Structures are given as C-alpha cells and as structure tokens.
Amino acid sequence: MAQIKITLTKSPIGRKPEQRKTVVALGLGKLNSSVVKEDNAAIRGMVTAISHLVTVEDVK
C-alpha cells in the first residue's frame, strides 16, 4: 500500500481542541516534525481536517 509523509507546518496553538487532538493522534509534535503513514481513508480524513496546518507528500 502507498505511504504519505505528513509534515506539521503551522502551529496548532489557538486551534479547536479537535484539531489539536488530531495533530497529536497523527504523531506530530513540534513544528516541522514529520511522520510517514499508510495512505488509507482514515489517515486521509485526519489530514483533511487539519489540511491548513500540514503538508502532504507521497513517499515512493
């Protein structure tokens, strides 16, 4: 299955609690931290909810 790299580019400070929890659930901590996750519907939904805070790249 394909993988995606998710990078936190903006701070979740001052955002809604649901958005902050989503950032933590993805395993992102500090700014510019990155994680590689499987590309599935659940992860895509989480990324969509915080798309204004993260950047997404395909991993080969």
Curated annotation (Swiss-Prot):
Molecular functions per Gene Ontology: structural constituent of ribosome
Superkingdom of the organism of origin: Bacteria
Similarity field: Belongs to the universal ribosomal protein uL30 family.
InterPro entries documented for this protein: Ribo_uL30_ferredoxin-like_sf, Ribosomal_uL30_bac-type, Ribosomal_uL30_CS, Ribosomal_uL30_ferredoxin-like
Protein name per UniProt: Large ribosomal subunit protein uL30
Keyword hit for Ribosomal protein: yes
Pfam family for this entry, one: Ribosomal_L30
Keyword check for GTP-binding: no
Species this protein is from: Streptococcus pyogenes serotype M1
Subunit: Part of the 50S ribosomal subunit.
Keywords: Ribonucleoprotein, Ribosomal protein
